[in-house]
């Protein structure tokens, strides 16, 4: 197990984010999305992201576990990650996914007015800032 407190904080952020993703989608699918002012096709646009976000959540949890357990890379993993610990490589993969999804949300919310207060703009702003911030934290930590 890692004795580095920064590693544990990063791993905790990864797991909390993964749990946040799960809670978001559970709540999202329990909401009708018929509020006035939502852009045309909102539900059809958003629904497929459950798949990418689920993959992201799994990568975040696996990365966190591997980061704190200090598991040395197996020979097959060395081919993929060089000699970098696999948890760090997965952290960078998660960072790329977070960056992509955060920029996509930023562009979509800005284009469709979903940053306005009446359209849960505060929550949407928090999602984008949190997503992009964690991406930068992971990149700075593991590059």
PLM region spans:
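Non-cytosolic membrane-interface motifs at loop->transmembrane helix junctions
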Residues: 39-46, 89-90, 113-127
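Juxtamembrane helix-break-helix junctions at the cytosolic face
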Residues: 60-91
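Interfacial segments of alpha-helical transmembrane regions
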Residues: 3-15, 79-94
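Membrane-helix boundary connector in multi-pass membrane proteins
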Residues: 103-123, 140-143
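Membrane-water interface at the C-terminal end of transmembrane alpha helices
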Residues: 126-143
């Amino acid at each position: 197990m890692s004795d580095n407190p920064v590693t544990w904080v990063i791993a905790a952020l990864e797991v909390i984010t993964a749990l946040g993703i799960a809670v978001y989608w559970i709540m999202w699918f329990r909401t009708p999305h018929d509020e006035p002012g939502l852009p045309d096709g909102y539900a059809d646009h958003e629904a497929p992201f459950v798949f990418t976000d689920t993959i992201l959540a799994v990568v975040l949890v696996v990365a966190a576990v591997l980061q704190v357990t200090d598991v040395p890379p197996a020979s097959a993993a060395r081919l993929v990650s060089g000699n970098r610990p696999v948890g760090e490589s997965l952290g960078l993969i998660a960072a790329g996914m977070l960056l992509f999804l955060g920029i996509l949300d930023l562009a979509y919310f800005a284009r469709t007015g979903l940053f306005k207060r009446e359209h849960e703009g505060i929550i949407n702003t928090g999602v984008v800032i949190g997503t992009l911030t964690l991406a930068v934290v992971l990149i700075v930590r593991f590059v």
